[in-house]
């Protein structure tokens, strides 16, 4: 089957990781793919067998980038002549080409809604515009996919989409890569990590969706009391310079380390450095609609996990420590660092592999597509 996949964002977005993972699995199962997106770097992603990859350079001038991406997506779509189109996010640079291709070739178009993107903006023109896109584009698609029950209810109640047009496609993980990963000395050397260091990872965007401003004061106090602890902050974004300056002002730049953007293929090896993974999301409507890839990857890597019950975190309640407030995190992290329970870690890995491994999630999705 020939499938055109249109990513509204760039290769460095968390949503893009989900979409690219689906693309790789579709290609692995023998389908012919053309994958298009905006790209922050010149060459975009690492190439993958079976995927024709194209990207348009992201300049930071959003209206221009969106306009150029819309045109390139349409041109490549016309040339590729897909049997169906899979779109990430209800944005014009993906939805307009998909709708035109549907009108021209009469094929099926599918839209993945994985966030309430407009809720991350303050009241104003941009928020209203993105909300308009959310209300306008989804009704024209043959199928809507989503990964969170709260978000699914929003799509039904607020966007007026029939439940029969919605397919629940969980957030998956490339579990085999995390299960097979080994400690890589290069990463230890890169960040000056010693064998007896107690490493904690916090992986998240440091852009407009970030909640790190709530986490940083807690980490400051925590590392001040435990001299062997080092924090790896994995991620990048527009607010990263602000957070780096705060850490330097605290004098903790050798204890709280910012890795910057990492290629997602590096994550299994980087997580092998750590004992504990933490995830905090403020209890907002936007965050309630999320399905954390971080929690899934932490568990797949065998880490102890401390998080709060926002998004779909409670689905992992038997394998993580849930804290209702940020003030509970230090005690929970300290306890997790002292725990030695490899059997529980293996049970968590099996749970993630059984329920959130991309091969069977994509197989089920394809079966549904063939029936619809």
Regions found by a protein language model. Give the residues of each.
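Nucleotide-sugar-dependent
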Residues: 13, 210, 263-270, 275-299, ...
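A short helix/loop element that forms part of the nucleotide-sugar donor recognition site in Leloir-type
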Residues: 179-193
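Nucleotide-activated donor-binding/catalytic signature segment of Leloir-type glycosyltransferases, i.e.
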Residues: 241-268
